[in-house]
Amino acid sequence: MRNILKKLALLLVPVAAYFAVFLAFEPNNYFGLHKVTDSESSISRLKAFQREKGSRVIIGDSRLAHFDLDLDGQASGKTWQTLAFGGASLKENNDLLAWVLKENPDLQEAVFGLSFYTLNKSYNADRMATLEKTLANPFAYLFNLEYNVNMLTALSERLQGVQSGGAGETGDWQYPADYTDPDTGAVYPVHRTLAVYPQAILPRCRDWAVNTAQLERLYALADECAARGVKLTVVLPPMADTVLTQVCEPLGIAGEMTGTVLPALREAADAHGFALLDYEWTDRPAYDEDTQFYDGFHLDTRYGLPQWTETLFAALR
């Protein structure tokens, strides 16, 4: 029996060593062992909120995920915590708002991202239930393949001396190299990353229809916010003209949004007690899309996002 235990102990040594490395290098700071993390993943941000529940939160997809929180605070005079993450659907954002309301009874304010893209009924990702299970169960995190791959990537970058977090959504575009299609030689009027973006989102937008069930759920959550004294602001972030002219107008989305959806949203805002800030259709910022947009949905984090940050958060004072 003693020999068996010794053999088992020896077998467990490499496993224990691996998980020690995992704890040291996992980039999401799940266990709170690191002072800071630059991870923008959903698990990282939700776990940080569990450890320190802020009174003002930002909920949305990637267009609201890259704010400089110091600049947010300067413009609004308030302290914010971001829970926004890439690819978040309207359902996931509703789930997240419900979760925040449950987690923090002292919540004061929430910014909620919405757009024609997340309103699309076919864009209905559903990951919040899995996230909640992972938040509650450390072993689910430890044995999750994706998070282990993330750790190994972070470890590899550390060993190579590569700065974690990547280069960000920004570019100093050079003509003609960054304006030319490498396959056809065609020269675009805007930089290539922006020029090809409409084609990337076009397939998902072809059968566009409003997700009325999730929109009604948002209104119910707005009622809960109003009853609890939580200020809710629904924000439609700006998009580039290329998306408007090459996707929204040809597919009839623009007409539906401006003629039906937005008037209904304004009525709902009055009825359910939330504020509505529309930078996607009504108050489109006069940005130079070639320099201030990284792609069709995302403002350049150096040349466009800071300007919109000041506009948005000044409106939230």
Predicted regions and their residues:
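Hydrophobic membrane-insertion alpha-helices, especially the h-region
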Residues: 6-27
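Histidine-centered active-site loop/cap adjacent to the catalytic His
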Residues: 100, 292-317
